[in-house]
Amino acid sequence: MSRVAKAPVIHSANVEVTFVDGVITVKGPKGILTQKINKLVNIQHSKESNKLEFSPASNDPMGWAQAGTARALVRNMVQGVTEGYTVTLELVGVGYRAQSKDKSISLSLGYSHSIEYDLPKGVTVETPNNTTILLKGVDKQVLGQIASEIRAFRPPEPYKGKGVKYAGEQIVRKEAKKK
């Protein structure tokens, strides 16, 4: 039995939550997010106390698991439309650079060509310096997917640690071969 679903999601007064036909919509100061919710989950919304409570719709064994998943998704949506999310990537290596443009980012990662990555709607990019990329947006899943795709262009290698890594990520280093 999940304990995640038992905790309510409390949102601020400037967040509007609607639940119609299995689709929940969260509207806040930074944007609007929608998510389809499993039919095994009941959602009770108390507008006076700005509280969302999740419970299983039936005695199905997967009910509490789905309720916990739905609660986590809705909590991420509420946090996204109020505060937003930021993912920081670091480029480690000689000549590795990033430049942000309007809706794309240009990466120079040691290949014979530079890589142009177009960003989807709702995601902004900043490059405070040549080796740091700041991705900002309201949808946590989309932001993580973009960061993962950018990291996949040149993942950190274990010998020198060169590549694209998340800020704060510890790269497990290997020792070089000894004669």
UniProtKB/Swiss-Prot annotation:
UniProt KW keywords: Ribonucleoprotein, Ribosomal protein, RNA-binding, rRNA-binding
Keyword rRNA-binding: yes
GO cellular component annotations of the record: cytosolic large ribosomal subunit
MF (Gene Ontology): rRNA binding; structural constituent of ribosome
InterPro entries noted in UniProt: Ribosomal_uL6-like, Ribosomal_uL6-like_a/b-dom_sf, Ribosomal_uL6_a/b-dom, Ribosomal_uL6_bac-type, Ribosomal_uL6_CS
Family matches, as Pfam families: Ribosomal_L6 (PF00347)
PROSITE patterns the record matches: RIBOSOMAL_L6_1
Entry annotated with the keyword Nucleotide-binding: no
GO biological process: cytoplasmic translation
Lineage: superkingdom: Bacteria
Subunit (UniProt): Part of the 50S ribosomal subunit.
Protein function: This protein binds to the 23S rRNA, and is important in its secondary structure. It is located near the subunit interface in the base of the L7/L12 stalk, and near the tRNA binding site of the peptidyltransferase center.
UniProt record similarity statement: Belongs to the universal ribosomal protein uL6 family.
Protein name as catalogued: Large ribosomal subunit protein uL6
Annotated source species: Legionella pneumophila subsp. pneumophila (strain Philadelphia 1 / ATCC 33152 / DSM 7513)
